[in-house]
């Protein structure tokens, strides 16, 4: 038997947490969600609590109404094409994260992760790094495991290289930069 055509799946609404966009006037539609998003296991000593920042989707594109994740062709190589350059600094930390499905291409990995791969190797998802942000070719629709290595003092030098011309600061024509 089929359900009504006008019903939505129970998980169709947005939730607090990861999203690939934020639209003006739609923030109140989010609902609190206390489900587990990920589990992390460190090899050796875990970083201090103030170093446990997991970088998820970075909303770098603004069209005047909606902030969203900047679309970068998956095949593009960051440094070869003038993209972000990251300097590995600080203590290296190896870890494994089990991520629940997000339906997003962004992977919330420990900030400063410069090396990551699915566990076991040769399995989905295909992953790539753009600066300090990690993405998959397709949205993550099932639980995945990723092994990563992060440098706790890694720096993205994009702003130093491009100054105010960085895409993170671009606004559409006609938008007042003070609003």
Residue ranges and their predicted role:
Residues 1-179:
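Helix-boundary/low-complexity linker signature
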